[in-house]
Regions:
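Short acidic/polar hinge/loop motifs at secondary-structure boundaries
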Residues: 123-152, 172
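Outer-membrane beta-barrel and related beta-rich outer-membrane complex signature
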Residues: 225, 249-292, 331-334
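Cleavable N-terminal targeting peptides that direct proteins into the secretory/outer-membrane pathway or into
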Residues: 1-38
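Transmembrane beta-barrel wall of Gram-negative outer-membrane proteins
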Residues: 181-268, 298-314
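Extracytoplasmic beta-strand/coil segments of soluble accessory domains associated
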Residues: 36-39, 76, 80-124
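N-terminal periplasmic "start-of-domain" segments of outer-membrane beta-barrel proteins
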Residues: 41-76, 96-101, 150
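N-terminal periplasmic accessory domains that precede
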Residues: 75-78, 101-106, 119, 136-138, ...
């Protein structure tokens, strides 16, 4: 009789069961970890990075650059702080296109040269010279400006400007807000400078459709003698909508300006002789050869209209962007 044998078999059986249980728990824990890893992986968002090489220097204005300018300054003044870009205007308000010039790494945009292109939201706005068109800054109020991208050097194939030998300035307008909002601002300054601006963001006016409209009026006297007043009335609007798989964007701008020019200074000698006078007179004398320099006769009335409609959509894996635009420029001298 061996009473201890059953006890030994029980111990062996218990040991085997314990080993099987530990193995099963380990396998279950491993399966749980693998399942959790798969779940976490499925939760990760897909991140796509697209890059392209640029042959020339590209730069974009920062929010700090915009803060340095007042609402009365033109949109051109904001890019003056970018490296390699020099903007000259007749006065701090940019009210005189005749005196405005832009230089970018040796290329010019002025009365005699047209080597730098301009676009609005990437859309061509025609010529930017004084005689046959207008600069993009005439189509955009400073408050409606989102950013300016400067492409220095010969423009790439994506530029829609017809005058981009020396580079392109692409002025981008702000997008409509998702919520309804009314913005009103008043700006006052020296030389009887004043500007009144109002913008209304509609919020969602229809399914996936948002828009904003703005109006403004501004005036300022010339800083030479205060004998004339430059004025500008401006209206602008933008709408975005998604129709099916197509993103639509529409934009319209109207500008009515009465501007008086400043005569150019010819050389340092003339500037040293009278740094605060451009050679134009403030009083009418009745003597023909003298009144050629009468400031009130050095003025122009200009109306500028610009608009576009753009559609963006996908065809299989190809992005397609198509647009139509219209611009009209009228003006006369006094």
């Amino acid at each position: 009789m061996k009473p201890h044998l059953p006890m030994k078999q029980s111990v062996i059986a218990l040991s085997v069961l314990s080993a099987i249980s530990v193995t099963s728990l380990t396998a279950m824990a491993q399966d749980s970890k693998e399942q959790q890893a798969v779940t976490n992986k499925e939760k990760l968002e897909t991140i796509q990075v697209t890059g392209r090489s640029l042959s020339y220097a590209n730069s974009t204005i920062s929010s700090e650059m915009k803060k340095q300018q007042t609402p009365m300054t033109s949109a051109l003044s904001i890019i003056d702080n970018l490296p390699g870009v020099l903007v000259n205007e007749g006065d701090p308000f940019g009210s005189d296109e005749w005196s405005t010039s832009i230089s970018m790494r040796g290329f010019q945009l002025d009365l005699a040269s047209q080597q730098i292109g301009m676009t609005v939201d990437g859309i061509s706005n025609g010529n930017s010279n004084y005689g046959g068109g207008t600069k993009a800054s005439r189509y955009i109020d400073t408050e409606n400006l989102r950013s300016v991208e400067v492409s220095q050097g010969t423009a790439d194939i994506s530029s829609r400007s017809n005058e981009a030998l020396g580079g392109t300035l692409d002025f981008t307008t702000i997008r409509p807000r998702l919520d309804e909002k009314l913005t009103v601002s008043t700006t006052l300054g020296q030389y009887n400078a004043r500007k009144f601006y109002t913008r209304y963001d509609t919020g969602e006016i229809a399914k996936d459709t948002f828009a904003w409209v703005s109006i403004s009026t501004q005036q300022n006297d010339d800083y030479m003698g205060g004998s004339i007043t430059n004025s500008r009335d401006h209206a602008e609007g933008k709408i975005i909508s998604r129709v099916g798989e197509v993103d639509l964007t529409g934009y319209l701008s109207y500008d009515d300006a009465e501007e008086y020019t400043y005569q150019r200074i010819y050389g340092l000698g003339q500037y040293a002789q009278e740094p605060n006078w451009d050679g134009l007179t403030n009083n009418f004398s009745g003597v023909p050869y003298q009144d050629q320099a009468f400031r009130e006769t050095w003025g122009t009335e200009r109306e500028n209209l610009f608009g576009y409609l753009q559609a963006d959509f996908m065809v299989n894996d190809v992005e397609v962007s198509s647009n139509v635009y219209y611009h009209k420029n009228e003006g006369m001298g006094k």
